Amino acid sequence: MLKQMTVNSIIQYIEENLESKFINIDCLVLYSGFSRRYLQISFKEYVGMPIGTYIRVRRASRAAALLRLTRLTIIEISAKLFYDSQQTFTREFKKIFGYTPRQYRMIPFWSFKGLLGRREINCEYLQPRICYLKERNIIGQCFNFRDLVFYSGIDSKCRLGKLYDSLKKNTAITVSNRIPFHDKTNDIIARTVVWDRNKHFSDSEIKVDKGLYAYFFFNDTYDQYVHHMYNIYYNSLPIYNLNKRDGYDVEVIKRRNDNTIDCHYFLPIYCDDMEFYNEMQVYHNNIVKPEMSVTLGLPKS
């Protein structure tokens, strides 16, 4: 129990300080009061990798998110995450992800290969099912939100509050999000559209593109929604080597009588060859061929 509490505390400390100061094992020894050896053994036992590797890849993964979701310059991101120079940042980033920071920002899809999200002890990450959705033209009510760390900050909770207000009036809602949706600031902007077939109450019209989607399902309390969405992006996608395609996603959120929600989440993924299906078969045999359409009771557009 003591080891587990120590590792959880170390993980929390790392997350809170990635953009506050340079972190290494010496910082953690000073923070925790435990020896280097004890921390290394305990961390490796529960997380499966050395502390130094975890810090290095988490820092690069935060940089990857900032490259894709903000307009901060490479120099600004390098300084924000306490790399000693832009050259060091570029070299380290390419070693981990196979792209330079500039290349990573410019590729037409969001690559999650090699990314590492915040690890949680004894956590089982959601497994995707690959499916195909047809193109849909959608009308609905639109709002934007911004957050410097995707699905983890105050603004994401404000978005959650708006969705909850809609859900209180209905047993189920369908929403689509486009991430990122940039404005002229450097903040992460996302556009959320709550589907509504009533044109009098709708202020936006969007298109959900046809193509492959990674389908995730979870049932939990509403408070855990943000937690699940973070893990889908920063843990499930890297584990299953999936890349995010630009475009609107689809969420079907259903309210249950036990104060929990069912969330059916369809995330657009990028795939340029059919070998992808063979790779996914390694993880599960529940794949849906692209000629099939998954509806799950989605409201008609």
UniProtKB/Swiss-Prot annotation:
The keyword Transcription regulation applies. SUPFAM superfamilies: Homeodomain-like, Probable bacterial effector-binding domain. InterPro entries: GyrI-like, Homeodomain-like_sf, HTH_AraC, HTH_AraC-typ_CS, MarA-like, Reg_factor_effector_dom_sf, Tscrpt_reg_AraC-type_HTH. GO terms for molecular function: bacterial-type RNA polymerase holo enzyme binding; DNA-binding transcription factor activity; sequence-specific DNA binding. Disulfide bonds: none annotated. Positive regulator of F1 operon expression. This is F1 operon positive regulatory protein. The lineage of its organism: Bacteria, Pseudomonadati, Pseudomonadota, Gammaproteobacteria, Enterobacterales.
